[in-house]
From Swiss-Prot:
Binding-site list for DNA: R311, R316
Protein name: Holliday junction branch migration complex subunit RuvB
Lineage: Bacteria, Bacillati, Bacillota, Bacilli, Bacillales
Subunit organization: Homohexamer. Forms an RuvA(8)-RuvB(12)-Holliday junction (HJ) complex. HJ DNA is sandwiched between 2 RuvA tetramers; dsDNA enters through RuvA and exits via RuvB. An RuvB hexamer assembles on each DNA strand where it exits the tetramer. Each RuvB hexamer is contacted by two RuvA subunits (via domain III) on 2 adjacent RuvB subunits; this complex drives branch migration. In the full resolvosome a probable DNA-RuvA(4)-RuvB(12)-RuvC(2) complex forms which resolves the HJ.
Protein source organism: Bacillus mycoides (strain KBAB4) (Bacillus weihenstephanensis)
EC numbers on record: 3.6.4.-
Binding site for ATP: L21, R22, G63, K66, T67, T68, E129, D130, F131, R172, Y182, R219
Region feature Large ATPase domain (RuvB-L), mapped onto this chain: 1-182
Gene name of the encoded protein: ruvB
Annotated region described as Head domain (RuvB-H), given as residue ranges: 256-333
Length: 333
């Protein structure tokens, strides 16, 4: 997959920045009002009852703040957080080691929880339901099962693919919160806050321009801000003004709706070779040289969100809005 400025996935540079910018409380957290207000109630109720919070599943596109919310949940509950990921837990023993190290009330955060192997999920079921762990000691006829008690804990799972979770695992979460794309105003506030942390002056119109092209995603907004800051320092006086912002974003090939060269390649490929569709996913994959799951999980969600692409039983169809964006006429049927 091409290196992509507009990917919602986290890179090493993003991780360092996000840690320094991460809000510590729900009150400081910008956006996701519905999820935030619900979590506020659930956390307060759990604290009033002196209980652990129900297990929480956070799902939605990458870059919307799932890891940040997991850390805030632990902070609001006044407990420690232990972080791991689905791909990092390769064997049941790996999960057992993590679970037995938890202290009472701790939050266990599993990112990409949809990538847990089914055999590991089965170990997780009694841990989530009964706070116990069934482990097998020995092999063959002499093998025996031993049940270990675990301290009460809260599992917070994060996934970009809620549908990929098995039903038994999904049903064991008491709180399910879908994170939505951010509004331009919310992203603009995030950009201005990040600029303040960077100690760089930014024009409010420039912050709005970055926000408009950030695909509804804070991680992308902050990444664009970093790149625009570079242009402002090298090609201007260091202040992020509207003119330098527009110039930088054009040079970075990020158009006014936040589409980049890969989006253009996908949409124009369907328009020019298949008269706008419908065309099957595998055919699109072969045409633009990208794996089908990458197209489905990474490229398409935003195009669907802004109404440039439709998924139908017959295949992908480019919409009139996309034709208009490219200044092209739709073919006559």
């Amino acid at each position: 997959m091409d290196e992509r400025l507009l990917s919602g996935e986290s890179g090493y540079e993003d991780a360092d920045l996000e840690y320094s910018l991460r809000p510590q409380t729900l009150r400081q957290y910008i956006g996701q009002d519905k999820a935030k207000h619900n979590l506020e109630v659930f956390i307060e109720a759990a604290k009033m009852r002196e209980e652990t919070l129900d297990h929480v599943l956070l799902y939605g596109p990458p870059g919307l703040g799932k890891t940040t919310l997991a850390n805030i949940i632990a902070n609001e509950m006044g407990v420690n957080i232990r972080t791991t990921s689905g791909p990092a837990i390769e064997r049941p023993g790996d999960l057992a080691a993590v679970l037995t190290a938890l202290q009472p009330g701790d939050v266990l955060f599993i990112d990409e929880i949809h990538r847990l192997h089914r055999s590991i999920e089965e170990v997780l079921y009694p841990a989530m339901e009964d706070f116990c762990l069934d482990i097998v000691i020995g092999k063959g006829p002499s093998a025996r099962s031993v049940r270990l008690d675990l301290p009460p804990f809260t599992l917070v799972g994060a996934t970009t693919r809620a549908g990929a979770l098995s039903a038994p695992l999904r049903d064991r979460f008491g709180v399910l919160s879908r994170l939505e794309y951010y509004t331009v105003d919310q992203l603009s506030a995030i950009v201005e806050r990040t600029a303040e942390v960077f100690e760089v002056e930014i024009d409010s119109l420039a912050a709005l321009e970055i926000a408009r092209r950030a695909r509804g995603t804070p991680r992308i907004a902050n990444r664009l801000l970093r790149r625009v800051r570079d242009f402002a320092q090298v090609r201007s006086d260091g202040t992020i003004a509207m003119e330098i912002t527009q110039m930088a974003l054009e040079l970075l090939q990020v158009d006014k709706l936040g589409l980049d060269h890969i989006d253009h390649k996908l949409l124009l490929g369907i328009i020019e070779k298949f008269r706008g569709g419908p065309v099957g996913l595998e055919t699109v994959s072969a045409t633009i040289g990208e794996e089908s799951h990458t197209i489905e999980d990474v490229y398409e969600p935003y195009l669907l969100q802004i109404g440039f692409l439709q998924r139908t039983p017959r295949g992908r169809i480019v919409t009139p809005l996309a034709y208009e964006h490219f200044g092209m006429e739709m073919p006559k049927v």
